[in-house]
Amino acid sequence: MREVTVRKGEPIDRALKRLKTKLDVEGILDEMRRRRAFETPMDERRRKARSASKRNKVKWRYSNKSEETASETAETPASAPEA
């Protein structure tokens, strides 16, 4: 169970926000919302496929940037000594 200690002079709203961000980062709120109602196997497959496509888009975006910088450095000729 996650807990947040309320600091001296800290408003309750701030402590609740810290708790919510902790739970959100760990994915506990999403898990709780998902388990609130029964999910059919087909719905589960759809949800997983959607999240996988989102992950792949992000991976593709970042992998392209690293490939572009690698190809740019490979395309520039090395300074060779002229004879």
Curated annotation (Swiss-Prot):
Keywords of this entry: Ribonucleoprotein, Ribosomal protein
GO MF: structural constituent of ribosome
Skewed-composition ranges (Low complexity): 71-83
Extent of Basic residues compositional bias: 47-62
InterPro entries to which the protein is assigned, alphabetical: Ribosomal_bS21, Ribosomal_bS21_sf
Statement: the UniProt record of this protein carries the keyword Ribosomal protein: yes
GO biological process: translation
UniProt key word Ribonucleoprotein: yes
A Pfam entry, by short name: Ribosomal_S21
Region (Disordered): 40-83
Signal peptide residue numbers: none
Entry GO CC: ribonucleoprotein complex; ribosome
Family: Belongs to the bacterial ribosomal protein bS21 family.
NCBIfam families referenced in this protein's UniProt entry, alphabetically: S21p
HAMAP family (UniProt xref): Ribosomal_bS21
Annotated protein name in UniProt: Small ribosomal subunit protein bS21
Organism: Akkermansia muciniphila (strain ATCC BAA-835 / DSM 22959 / JCM 33894 / BCRC 81048 / CCUG 64013 / CIP 107961 / Muc)
Lineage of origin: Bacteria, Pseudomonadati, Verrucomicrobiota, Verrucomicrobiia, Verrucomicrobiales
